């Protein structure tokens, strides 16, 4: 099946005090989701199950992200999660704390019929 990107949306999330990379990633994905709309699917007669949703998240410690928590946020289509090194850790040496910032991109792919 050939696909074409219909939506690319970005988001940012953070965890201020817990150094929780999953929490920051979830917030980044939710932020991106709140900026997008799929109302056009009904007009084009495209079933949500046909979509491919690529979720890309960047944090400083990708191995610390629970992919299943991110995947559970997406309620449509075939979901693919990619976590890479990115985002930002802001260290506060005086307080002994780290602010975790995650970035996310959601890419919704539509099926395209070849003529």
Model-assigned labels for residue ranges:
Residues 76-115:
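C-terminal edge-of-domain segments
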């Amino acid at each position: 099946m050939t696909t074409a990107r219909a939506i690319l949306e970005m988001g940012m999330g953070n965890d201020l005090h817990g150094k929780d990379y999953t929490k920051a990633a979830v917030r980044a994905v939710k932020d991106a989701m709140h900026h997008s709309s799929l109302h056009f699917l009904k007009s084009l007669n495209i079933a949500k199950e046909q979509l491919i949703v690529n979720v890309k998240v960047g944090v400083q410690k990708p191995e610390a992200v629970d992919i299943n928590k991110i995947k559970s946020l997406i309620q449509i289509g075939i979901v693919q999660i990619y976590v890479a090194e990115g985002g930002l850790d802001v260290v506060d040496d005086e307080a002994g704390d780290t602010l975790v910032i995650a970035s996310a991109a959601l890419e919704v792919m539509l099926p395209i019929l070849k003529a």
